[in-house]
Amino acid sequence: MTTSTVLDASAVLALLQEEPGADEVERLLDGALMSCVNLSEVLQKAEQHGVHIEGLEYDLVALGVEFRDFDVSSARPTADAWSPGSGLSLGDRACLALAGQVGGTAVTTDARWADAGVDVDLRVLR
């Protein structure tokens, strides 16, 4: 059985901005999952940094990324991923919750996640 890869916004942004870890993210795209919360973060941050975002979500789908809606079943695990001082944003926690729900590996470039004390398989790219 293959473990699902769940992409954090930071991983996709690293790819778009050709930052360290971009090659690894590119290899993970086909079959990866991503919360629509994280997609929203990617679109906002990419536009903020001058990246053309028109149709970006469709480009990611064409590359094999499957977007998952953030719904009622996502709300509780996302809230439960919060802890005082963890520094995890809503987007971070949505990614972690999705990884937990599907038994997958959350992929991020945010090294702080390793110290957040979450019970999810993590892959920190840098």
Regions found by a protein language model. Name each.
Residues 2-4, 96-126:
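Acidic, PIN/NYN-like endoribonuclease modules and their adjacent C-terminal/linker elements
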Residues 11-12, 38, 74, 94-95, ...:
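Alpha-helix capping/helix-boundary segments
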Residues 66-105, 109:
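Active-site neighborhoods of divalent-metal-dependent phosphate/nucleic-acid chemistry enzymes
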Residues 7, 37, 109:
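Active-site flanking residues adjacent to catalytic metal/cofactor-binding acidic residues
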Residues 23-30, 46, 60-62, 85, ...:
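Alpha-helix C-terminal capping segments
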Residues 1-34, 46-58:
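Short, well-structured N-terminal submotif of metal-dependent ribonuclease cores
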Residues 31-34, 63-66, 105:
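Short loop->beta-strand "edge-of-pocket" segments that line small-molecule binding or catalytic clefts
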